[in-house]
From Swiss-Prot:
Highest taxon listed in the record's lineage: Bacteria
TM annotation in the entry: 2-22, 39-59, 64-84, 110-130, 134-154, 158-178
InterPro entries found in the cross-reference section: ATPase_P-typ_TM_dom_sf, Mntp/YtaF, Put_MntP
Signal sequence range: none
Protein name per UniProt: Putative manganese efflux pump MntP 2
Subcellular compartments: Cell inner membrane
Record organism: Psychrobacter cryohalolentis (strain ATCC BAA-1226 / DSM 17306 / VKM B-2378 / K5)
Job description of the protein: Probably functions as a manganese efflux pump.
GO molecular function term, any single one: manganese ion transmembrane transporter activity
Family designation: Belongs to the MntP (TC 9.B.29) family.
Keywords: Cell inner membrane, Cell membrane, Ion transport, Manganese, Membrane, Transmembrane, Transmembrane helix, Transport
Topology term for the membrane: Multi-pass membrane protein
UniProt main location, coarse: membrane
Lineage: Bacteria, Pseudomonadati, Pseudomonadota, Gammaproteobacteria, Moraxellales
One term under GO cellular component: plasma membrane
């Protein structure tokens, strides 16, 4: 279960970083408007991060029989590649992008974009001794909570914290991948 919690935290890092950026763009001083926006961010990101690994899990279940012996190595490659991608993206974030139009279309696009990594990670859930549905629920709830928290942090701190969160998430994915083959 520890692996699921670490995976949830790592996968939530993209959404957390994006939420910090979105929170930093909030112009209104009205707390109720900000709270609504933060909760909406949490719902969009949480649902996307919960559904994508489920899709990956379903695809992985289908394909697992085809390469059962090498499955741990495939999971290793996927998680390490995703981790390296997150590390790279954390260094190439443009922190000057501070004004974003926060429509439902924008939130949906960001939620899908930040959850694509979760689909790849969901593929590896077949290799962990966990209930995949419970794991996806944990991933969704973790992402939702961290996204709301990220929006609040972004409102107070600006965007500088987002890239560090994404880098940490990348390192955790790499560590989980290495653990699967050790």
């Amino acid at each position: 279960m520890l692996e699921v919690l670490l995976l949830a935290l790592a996968l939530a890092a993209d959404a957390f970083a994006a939420s910090i950026g979105l929170g930093s763009t909030h112009k209104s001083d009205v707390n109720s408007q900000f709270m609504k926006m933060a909760l909406l961010i949490g719902v969009y990101f949480g649902v996307a991060q919960g559904v994508m690994p489920l899709i990956g899990y379903a695809l992985g279940s289908t394909m697992l029989g085809w390469f059962a012996e090498g499955a741990s190595w495939v999971a290793f490659v996927i998680l390490v590649a995703l981790g390296i991608k997150m590390l790279y993206e954390s260094r190439s974030v443009n922190n000057d992008e501070t004004r974003i139009n926060l429509s439902h279309k924008t939130l949906l696009s960001l939620a899908i974009a930040t959850s694509l990594d979760a689909m790849g990670a969901g593929f590896t859930l077949n290799l962990l001794a966990v209930n995949a549905y419970l794991a996806c629920l944990i991933i969704a709830l973790t992402t939702a909570v961290l996204s709301v928290l990220g929006a609040y942090i972004g409102r107070k701190s600006g965007t500088w914290l987002g890239s560090w969160a994404e880098a940490l998430g990348g390192l955790v994915l790499i560590a989980i991948g290495v653990n699967m083959v050790v």
